[in-house]
Amino acid sequence: MRSPLQSCSASEGRAVEAALSVDHAGGRSVLRRQNVGYPLHVTRGFHLDAARPDLLTLYLQSASGGLYAGDRIALDVSVARDAAFHLTTQAATVVHDGRGIGALQRQTITVDSGAFCAITTDPYVLFPGAELALDTVATVADDAVLCVADGFAVHDPRASGRAFSEFSGRLRVLRPDGHLLLHDAGRVSGDELHGALGPFAAAANLIIVAPPDRLPSVKSLQQAADGCGALAGASRAPNDAGLVLRILAPDGGTLSRATDAAFHVAAAAALGVTLSRRRK
């Protein structure tokens, strides 16, 4: 769901809504509809992969400095039948002091039959006092593929000794008939961080929902992340939904590289080709 959205500072935060709709037309995936307002900005679409010219890659950018207390962000992504779409971010998102009210980001994702959708965000950088909740609901057709990656890294720029407040995430994946396929949820507070993560200061999840013949092996996912200096563990998702990869890293940079490497393994299995690196 590392966020594609960032909002400006305000005394009570701000509410921001964005919607992206991707269709398949003329042998390519195209951005058919967008509703994105300040402080968000959508780059032009890129078709970066010669072996998969139908795959549309899009970067969401922001004119602001991160997520602030009281921010309420909503993103709606719809990927139509047979379309292929990768949404990513230009850089990590700073999460500022939540001042007791925190920030909330909601994502609603729809992936139609035969479609591929990947939403991979750079880590959320949690400053002292930061509080962020992520809530994603995805509806995925039986023969479609969804990859969602998000995570966080801790940073205390002034060496104040204060911990972040809380980071929580929830992902629910449903079939078009409403059947709940997967429910993944977690929460960690700054005071609990070392007990939960040990010596690590960054963590991420990569969740892949796909038919069995379009999944990578558990070993290949783990090796891709471990090879970047992270510690990773993968397992089968409930209800034969796909795979879940957990990644721990010493810092945000290592986490980004490990998550990206694992995503490329997942994408190669799902699409049948090796994707080019997304420059940032």
Swiss-Prot record:
Q: Does the keyword Secreted apply?
A: no
Q: Cite the InterPro entries for this sequence.
A: UreD
UniProt GO cellular component terms: cytoplasm
Alphabetically ordered keywords of this record? Chaperone, Cytoplasm, Nickel insertion
Keyword Chaperone carried by entry: yes
UniProt organism field: Bradyrhizobium sp. (strain ORS 278)
Assigned protein family: Belongs to the UreD family.
* Principal cellular location given in the protein's record: cytoplasm
Q: Which HAMAP family match?
A: UreD (MF_01384)
From the Swiss-Prot or TrEMBL record, give the protein name: Urease accessory protein UreD 3
According to the record's subunit comment, the protein's assembly and interactions are: UreD, UreF and UreG form a complex that acts as a GTP-hydrolysis-dependent molecular chaperone, activating the urease apoprotein by helping to assemble the nickel containing metallocenter of UreC. The UreE protein probably delivers the nickel.
Listed GO MF terms: nickel cation binding
Alphabetical list of Pfam families matching this protein: UreD (PF01774)
Coiled-coil segments on the chain, per record: none
Free-text function comment from the UniProt entry: Required for maturation of urease via the functional incorporation of the urease nickel metallocenter.
Locations listed in the record: Cytoplasm
